[in-house]
Amino acid sequence: METVGVLCARARVEEKSLMAALAAAGIVSAIFPPVDEPLPVGPLAIAPSGNPFPVPRLVIDRHQDRQIARAVLASCRALGVPALSAGVAATGDRLDVASALAAHGLPRPHSALCTSEEAALKAVRFSGLPATLMPLDMKSGGIALLDQDTAEAVLEHRAVLGGSERSLGLIQAGAPTAHQRAEIIVIDGRATALEPGSDLACGPVERRMAEEAARALRADLVAVTVARIGSEPIVWDVHPAPDFRDAMPIAVLTVAEAVAHAVAQRLRTMDAASLAQDLGSWIAITPEGVHDDIVIRA
């Protein structure tokens, strides 16, 4: 099926505008995976029902449920279907993201992984207040810990709820307000738009930092939160499937148009690679075939 799949549960305003931009670029798209079709497990494109599975050429990750997104992206990899996604942020958690950004040398707030209430309180005392509790799952926002009473109440509440999901988290130094941060959407390596509510002045330094963060995460489509708590900007957080209905374009293209442009480029690259492979096979076979087929008769 020569179709680009838009990975989502339903088409919201963002996905509808994205599919319209793809159509304007001459690219057929559809919601993926089909709601009524189970996905195959493994490299064969045969659904568990026995029917051929509608495999798209490329998938755009827009799913708001990151657990479902990770599972579907894994299935796509098994089928050999590339994805336009947030890279490490699409398939990992905040610890994976923080580790990748730190390994790349990008400026980040002091962070500590905590596995218990006691460890989190110790991390808060070490980093100082205010601080922010960042759940490991990408779908949950950070919780500002503005004073000691708030920190103890929040961490105790999570401990009482129980479970490893509630116990695990990152404590990050600082708690930037709206006017101290900017949400920059990076598409195919370029800062493309600002999410609404981004009050921090977004200059060349912030845009370059967001682009560098996207490269560190191997992300094609991601929102990077750049914060300025002190004198220098830092990478605060990322969002693998950002809302962009009210996003303000930095240049000419809207987010939907920029994604459609990136998809068109990716499809052209895939076509060129496929053609080169076919030509290579033809060149490798032809000389032997020509010599074998020549017959000289007296």
Positions of predicted regions on the chain:
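Phosphate-binding site of ATP-dependent enzymes
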Residues: 144-217
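ATP-grasp fold ATP-binding core
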Residues: 98-102, 124-145, 163-177
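Conserved N-proximal alpha/beta basic substrate-recognition cap immediately N-terminal to
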Residues: 9-111
